[in-house]
Amino acid sequence: MLLNTPAQLSLPLYLPDDETFASFYPGENPSLLAAIQSAVHQPHGSYIYFWSREGGGRSHLLHAACAELSQQGEAVGYVPLDKRAYFIPEVLEGMEQLALVCIDNIECIAGDEQWEMAMFNLYNRIVETGRTRLLITGDRPPRQLNLGLPDLASRLDWGQIYKLQPLSDDEKLQALQLRAKLRGFELPEDVGRFLLKRLDREMRTLFMTLDQLDRASITAQRKLTIPFVKEILSL
């Protein structure tokens, strides 16, 4: 769990420094991106739920929202429920005091009575206060989460619901090139297409590989070419 909170709730917030709104390539998701940015900049509470298959950019958008408000000195919280084994449901208590609460991978608590009730209670407290922005992600629409608590499924279905559309191969190439540009180097189109052809096309894998190639090119003082990529990745 990652928090940047008032003193009484103080825990450090660690966010990937490269997962911001500026580095997010929206593809066919400009409406979702605009909705999240609007929610972040509004002074009152709001709720957005968006879903996609794993690796579709869900966490990136939550990290970006946290970073945006955290940089403004606001109190924010990010809870990755796929890692809930490392904390307990009581961590959600008091989060209605924060400016932004991001709940990632809510599908992971399906069937867990304690976590479902804790999430249900947090949702209700946030609605009552009317101040907190709430962003929740899942791997499917709220009504298909197989939650054991029907009232929680109903609450999750009340807000703005979006499907995070996957990127096409051309859009993945542009996302990689944007990532490279923000890191200060160029990814030639032929190299990008080679990576898409030879590697797992899941974006997290592609970004990790791009970072690896960036470090290797700096060390070797060479530009990214297909022969160099083959050498570094043993392809």
Swiss-Prot record:
Keywords: DNA replication, DNA replication inhibitor. Pfam families: Bac_DnaA, Hda_lid. Gene3D superfamilies: 1.10.8.60, P-loop containing nucleotide triphosphate hydrolases. Transmembrane segments: none annotated. GO terms for biological process: DNA replication initiation; negative regulation of DNA-templated DNA replication initiation. InterPro entries: Chromosome_initiator_DnaA-like, DnaA_dom, Hda, Hda_Enterobact, Hda_lid, P-loop_NTPase. The active form seems to be an ADP-bound monomer. Forms the RIDA complex (regulatory inactivation of DnaA) of ATP-DnaA, ADP-Hda and the DNA-loaded beta sliding clamp (dnaN). Belongs to the DnaA family. HdA subfamily. PANTHER family: CHROMOSOMAL REPLICATION INITIATOR PROTEIN DNAA, DNAA REGULATORY INACTIVATOR HDA. Mediates the interaction of DNA replication initiator protein DnaA with DNA polymerase subunit beta sliding clamp (dnaN). Stimulates hydrolysis of ATP-DnaA to ADP-DnaA, rendering DnaA inactive for reinitiation, a process called regulatory inhibition of DnaA or RIDA. This is DnaA regulatory inactivator Hda. It comes from Yersinia pestis (strain Pestoides F).
